[in-house]
């Protein structure tokens, strides 16, 4: 079954809209980072962090709009984007994102939350409800 059809099921469509809101929240966090509202001036953060802020802001805005509109390709975008832009960098280059001891716990929480959100979405897509 095409993914756009799966997004037409009531619970899957509702969850897609919920994920869109979660992604918009993430986008506002990246805007806050860039504006220096989250504690550290953006230009004093590592270049990798700044690049990730830009990449994730772009991804989260496009994915949120596409999910909200129920576009079939948004399913692939969300899974590939979260895996490629969060799981891989935050595990492969983990030390680059941990400047203070509490950063490790924050990363673990973020990855756990993302895994849960993707797992629920996958479950809804598979059971097609």
Feature locations, PLM:
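Topology signature of small-to-medium multi-pass alpha-helical membrane proteins
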Residues: 1-129
